[in-house]
Amino acid sequence: MSNRKYFGTDGIRGRVGDAPITPDFVLKLGWAAGKVLARHGSRKIIIGKDTRISGYMLESALEAGLAAAGLSALFTGPMPTPAVAYLTRTFRAEAGIVISASHNPFYDNGIKFFSIDGTKLPDAVEEAIEAEMEKEISCVDSAELGKASRIVDAAGRYIEFCKATFPNELSLSELKIVVDCANGATYHIAPNVLRELGANVIAIGCEPNGVNINAEVGATDVRALQARVLAEKADLGIAFDGDGDRVIMVDHEGNKVDGDQIMYIIAREGLRQGQLRGGAVGTLMSNMGLELALKQLGIPFARAKVGDRYVLEKMQEKGWRIGAENSGHVILLDKTTTGDGIVAGLQVLAAMARNHMSLHDLCSGMKMFPQILVNVRYTAGSGDPLEHESVKAVTAEVETALGSRGRVLLRKSGTEPLIRVMVEGEDEAQVTEFAHRIADAVKAV
């Protein structure tokens, strides 16, 4: 990814109004993408977005660029990222485009692409789009210009798809669920899916106004969900992020259940049902407790680099069907082509219904190691803090102290100028002290 000018690990992302998330850039991006994708013969592109106010501006710019290249845009309106992947497949569109910055604040936005099969766009196609961006815009003949239309039943189509991943013989009629949609793209999808499957649903974070996406709600901040689950005496809570590709859950006692625990539940249930093929893929950030719990079940486990595209690559490399990040990206290739928060949540609910067990009890087979994550902001272009001798020295000291019962991981964020410092071990006070010691060394560089 290092030779890319625009595309990062998850498309193109930034603050709205600052390069590259500007109307003129996005218009040209639409044109360049159209020029590359038109070579493959199809003239349709699905465009979805989350609930950010800037989505209106950016979808208009994209549509203008695509039309100039001779491609037609099909708008879904606010729609979860995995829904765009699904609709791209079912419409046989040449590609899908999502306008979203996922879990970021409203003032950020981004553009990411799906290929015709609902997977992330291949590197070669992204590189071809970047090459096209260097050229001057040229417009096709007037008779060949693209058009724009709306998919009026997009939400209903995706709701039915989600429900179809839940076993027909099961129902959610015995469950009281608080669902938190982060004032994002799942606000009109997830509550309806759960209600139609029989659940008693209390919905929060379902009043988007363009600027409140991910604001103290959703998968990145479950405090409101935890409080509501306890207040309502609900069986559990489910939180999605702004674009619906992540899910985090909360049990009836208010405990957070992250992506590692969700994958453990789904993998164990797959094993019990005789449906698990191969092992499970986590990341360098996955908890040691997950690895040990899967090992006890005889389920192979592999770690990929952080990022859902790398999880998917490792899954494809090994021929495995389940992968996840602890942040809540869960990829179930027997059900979907990309991370899907609603579909992953439904598989956990199916395990609860089938086994008549609470979420708390389903998690009990996995002991989480204390894991402390500290984010340190640095000035982009000021050198690599991870290569500084003082940082290396402190990191080595901590690794020696932890021995084989802990881990240290330092990595750069793929989307922001942040160094993520993660320390994991058996003693929470110790790993907290170690994490802040390394973070202080990074700050001092």
Curated annotation (Swiss-Prot):
Example GO molecular function: phosphoglucosamine mutase activity
InterPro entries for this protein: A-D-PHexomutase_a/b/a-I (IPR005844), A-D-PHexomutase_a/b/a-I/II/III (IPR016055), A-D-PHexomutase_a/b/a-II (IPR005845), A-D-PHexomutase_a/b/a-III (IPR005846), A-D-PHexomutase_C (IPR005843), A-D-PHexomutase_C_sf (IPR036900), A-D-PHexomutase_CS (IPR016066), Alpha-D-phosphohexomutase_SF (IPR005841)
Catalytic residues of the enzyme: S102
Co-factor remark: Binds 1 Mg(2+) ion per subunit.
Cofactor or coenzyme needed: Mg(2+)
Binding-site positions, Mg(2+): S102, D241, D243, D245
One GO location term (cellular component): cytosol
Uppermost EC category: isomerase
Record EC number: 5.4.2.10
GO BP terms: carbohydrate metabolic process; peptidoglycan biosynthetic process; UDP-N-acetylglucosamine biosynthetic process
Catalysed reaction, written as an equation: alpha-D-glucosamine 1-phosphate = D-glucosamine 6-phosphate
Modified residues (Phosphoserine): S102
Pfam families noted in UniProt: PGM_PMM_I, PGM_PMM_II, PGM_PMM_III, PGM_PMM_IV
Modification after translation, per record: Activated by phosphorylation.
Alphabetical keyword list: Isomerase, Magnesium, Metal-binding, Phosphoprotein
Record function comment: Catalyzes the conversion of glucosamine-6-phosphate to glucosamine-1-phosphate.
Family: Belongs to the phosphohexose mutase family.
Protein name, entry field: Phosphoglucosamine mutase
The species this protein was found in: Escherichia coli O157:H7
